[in-house]
């Protein structure tokens, strides 16, 4: 009896939201994949799936990976880390069933798979068992800088990418030391982040955008953002000071 050649695991970055920002390579592999997996909240279609839906044909298997309805703050004996780890274990085995049957599986990921992408957790579980390939995508901070018209770093400057979930003192220290910064994962952390920016005198350089490159993108002055209304898909760009050697003259 001949053994079945296992399928390939593909992690495809599909860009920050604008469907035209998917790469040619990701699109080619997506169209050729028998199975397409995508992360989604219960009852939702999902942003990543919305980006690529028009490129799929009826023969391709759609495999939604539905996040558990939970929160990071749970009462004992429940634990967010355990629940989400179990979810990724189960999702990985769903993919493995197709891979073992010889079917390639493309897992789509908004932005870039290895930049805060949920695909990473499947890659950690499966890449040692199956042939895999990761296709990079345009990540949200680059989409954000583009729509804001804000060059991130000049010449020898360094860029710090920070998570809004950092403790306030740690966030303050890192922003104070940064030539330029992008703060991700705002949501309910927005008020803390804005407070730190004001304390450091960075609020005038700081630029805020929600859902960069998506159809419902919003660019709002930092002082006018409602803290409780800041969505997960929002970020703040603090560009580096302009390099005078590149400044144009009159």
From Swiss-Prot:
CDD domains per the UniProt record, alphabetical: Precorrin_2_C20_MT
Known pathway: Cofactor biosynthesis; adenosylcobalamin biosynthesis; cob(II)yrinate a,c-diamide from precorrin-2 (aerobic route): step 1/10
EC number: 2.1.1.130
InterPro entries: 4pyrrol_Mease (IPR000878), 4pyrrol_Methylase_sf (IPR035996), 4pyrrole_Mease_sub1 (IPR014777), 4pyrrole_Mease_sub2 (IPR014776), CobI/CbiL (IPR012382), CobI/CbiL/CobIJ_dom (IPR006364)
Catalysis: reaction(s): precorrin-2 + S-adenosyl-L-methionine = precorrin-3A + S-adenosyl-L-homocysteine + H(+)
Pfam families per the UniProt record, alphabetical: TP_methylase
Keywords: Cobalamin biosynthesis, Methyltransferase, S-adenosyl-L-methionine, Transferase
Broadest EC class assigned to this enzyme: transferase
GO molecular function: precorrin-2 C20-methyltransferase activity
Gene Ontology BP term (one): methylation
Similarity comment: family membership: Belongs to the precorrin methyltransferase family.
Assembly notes: Homodimer.
Entry protein name: Precorrin-2 C(20)-methyltransferase
Gene label: cobI
């Amino acid at each position: 009896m001949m053994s079945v050649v296992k399928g390939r695991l593909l992690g495809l970055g599909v860009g920050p939201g604008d469907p035209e920002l998917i790469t040619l390579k990701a699109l080619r592999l997506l169209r050729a994949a028998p199975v397409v997996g995508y992360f989604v909240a219960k009852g939702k279609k999902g942003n990543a799936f919305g980006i690529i839906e028009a490129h799929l044909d009826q023969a391709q298997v759609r495999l939604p990976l539905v996040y558990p309805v939970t929160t990071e703050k749970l009462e004992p004996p429940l634990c967010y880390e355990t629940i989400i780890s179990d979810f990724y274990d189960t999702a990985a085995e769903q993919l493995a069933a197709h891979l073992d049957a010889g079917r390639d599986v493309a897992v789509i990921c908004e932005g870039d798979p290895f930049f805060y992408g949920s695909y990473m957790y499947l890659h950690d579980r499966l890449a040692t068992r199956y042939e895999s390939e990761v296709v990079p995508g345009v990540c949200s901070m680059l989409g954000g800088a583009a729509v804001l018209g804000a060059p991130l770093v000049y010449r020898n400057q360094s860029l710090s990418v920070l998570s809004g979930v950092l403790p306030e003192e740690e966030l303050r220290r890192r922003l104070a030391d940064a030539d330029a910064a992008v703060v991700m994962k705002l949501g309910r952390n927005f008020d803390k982040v804005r407070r730190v920016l004001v304390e450091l005198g960075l609020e005038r350089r700081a630029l805020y955008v929600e859902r960069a490159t998506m159809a419902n993108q919003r660019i709002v002055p930092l002082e006018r953002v409602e803290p409780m209304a800041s969505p997960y898909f929002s970020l703040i760009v603090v560009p580096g000071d302009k390099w005078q050697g590149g400044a144009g003259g009159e």
